[in-house]
Amino acid sequence: VIHKPVFSIIVPVYNVENYLNACVQSLINQTFSDIEIILVDDGSPDNCPAMCDTYAAADSRVHVVHQPNSGLSVARNTGLAHAAGSYVLFVDSDDIINLDTCQRLLPFVDKSADIIIGDGISVGSRKKLSHGYTAACVRGDMYLKLALHEGSMPMAAVLYIYRREFLQENRLVFKPGILHEDEQFTPRAFLSAERVIESGICFYHYITRDDSITTQQDLRKNAADLYDSILELTDLYKQLADQKLKNRLLDSLVTKYLSLFQAGRLQQYGKAYIHKRFVLCNARHPKTVCKALLFAISPPLYWHVNNWVKQRRA
């Protein structure tokens, strides 16, 4: 009988030889040992492939998959295809998790939740990425509604621990070839989940670095992919029967779109991404509606007014 570990920890690896050891050490030294660590070498051009093989040779819980460079989404999907654990964690190869993470998650595993919710902290800025709502097991759509009402719903997949069979049953995978894959994956997962529970455990440490995969990406593709994800999610949300949830989700997409515009990551690419109809049709909250109307009158005016308000608050 093949032993199935409690946790599968999936780590896509690409061009992180200076950070990989800290990441892997935070995994192999977990105080709870019934885990497997799946390192997916995504065609890394540096010393990472050899490092991965060394870890696997030293610890039978470490498994390595080498594949041609295919991007973060495909690497995570590869890890999922090889995973055997009851629950799955995603860890980026330049980040770390607390050594007692799996130990502290065990009581929540016993509750058979589809998704266990955790929190993270951005090392350097000390900015905490957390969830504002605490409850017993609730349906995923209910949690989304409450979290959006509280204004606290981080989309990063690394903050959530997923029951592996739940992901399989609902065919939940990451969309290949795009940045911001979490922006689509996380809401889809929550809308499919029957039982989600918040752990209150802050376990994940984001290590921000200037040469990271995300920071170096071409900003145009970054903006375009997020824009496309917003439009795809709009189609998904419009099919929801729960009107209150639908309104909150659509409103959150308008807020995300306007934030993207405000950050200067849309308007510099011309009219292709200026989508007044989307903003006007999907704004729901009175504050968002006011912003949408101003944006519809004049996107540059919206940008200047928003900047002025930010400066006044600073």
What are these regions (language model features)?
Residues V1-N29:
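N-proximal low-complexity "stem/linker" segments adjacent to membrane-targeting elements
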Residues N18-N21, I35, D46-Y55, I96, ...:
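Acidic helix N-cap motif at the loop->helix transition within catalytic regions
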Residues S26, S33, D41-M51, P68-S70:
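A conserved acidic beta->alpha catalytic loop
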Residues Q67-A83:
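Glycine-rich, basic loop-to-helix element that forms the pyrophosphate-binding segment
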Residues L72, S93-I197, I207-L219:
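Donor-binding/catalytic cores of nucleotide-activated saccharide
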Residues V88:
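Short aromatic/hydrophobic "clamp" motif used to bind/position activated sugar donors
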Residues F203-D210, Q216-K244, R265-N282:
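Catalytic core of nucleotide-sugar-dependent glycosyltransferases
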Residues L266-A314:
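Membrane-interface aromatic/basic loop that binds lipid-linked glycans or pyrophosphate carriers
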